[in-house]
Amino acid sequence: MLMAGLRGDYSNEHGFFVTPRAHLKYNPNEYVHFRLSAGKGYRTNHVLAENNYLLSSSRKVEIAKGLDMEEAWNYGASVSTYVPVFGKTLNINAEYYYTDFLKQVVVDMDSNPHEVAFYNLDGRSYSHVFQVEASYPFFKGFTLTGAYRLTDAQTTYKGQRMEKPLTSKYKGLLTASYQTPLGIWQFDATLQLNGGGRMPSPYELADGQLSWERRYGSFEQLSAQITRYFRRWSVYIGGENLTNF
């Protein structure tokens, strides 16, 4: 099945622009589903609202005049499979997405370690994201889900293409959920693995040491919740960051 669309918008700030989009779905049988998508996207960047966490730092904020509306091509592909295993269904889903920016507002924390600058992209900026997810009900009421994601995000900072800072190269997720036969109690646990990534470029202190490490390492976070259901309401108790990161 093919579905295509064309949308037109007018902005008093950016004028008229057209957004094309296309989706393709193919099911060779009841167990396998393929999907493809492609299209263009536009977005107005509100630099202070979207990056307000930087205002609490000691960095000076520099915002260039005439920031463009962001413009990018997006491409995606996914395959979903439903595999019968011991009388139950194992769900496996794999996805890949590629975003290629034609225009982008760059958040530059590398050119000057004491400053954060916002300016229009001059060069390439893109991201590749691949994710695979699997879910299986081992027995009645108990489901285990696992997911893993790889990310490659690159942006050009004043002529130099670099890995986007503060972006984990990979992430993993494992969730377990169990509901008692009468549906009165439910137990949930989630373990998340956050991979390492690049820090903004550091500066050298008076003693020759770097202000911070160039990269940060991976870390895990665990959360859990217990829920008690009643006829018209429910109550729960839970904890986050139980690994104390």
Where do the PLM segments sit?
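Repeated loop/turn-to-beta-strand initiation elements of outer-membrane beta-barrel proteins
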Residues: M1-L2, Y31-F34, V85-I92, G141-L144, ...
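Membrane-embedded beta-barrel scaffold of Gram-negative outer-membrane proteins
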Residues: N27, H33-R35, D68-N120, R124-Y126
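Residue-level signature of outer-membrane beta-barrel architecture
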Residues: F16, Y26, K40, M69, ...
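Gram-negative outer-membrane beta-barrel transporters
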Residues: Y96-D100, N120-Y203
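Residues that define the transmembrane beta-barrel architecture of outer-membrane proteins
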Residues: F16-V18, E71-Y75, Y98, R124-H128, ...
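Surface-exposed extracellular loop regions of Gram-negative outer-membrane beta-barrel proteins
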Residues: M1-N12, F17-R21, Y136-D152
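C-terminal beta-signal and adjacent terminal beta-strands/loops
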Residues: Y42, L193-E204, I226-F245
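Transmembrane beta-barrel strands of outer-membrane/channel proteins
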Residues: A4-G8, L36-K40, I92-Y98, G146-L150, ...
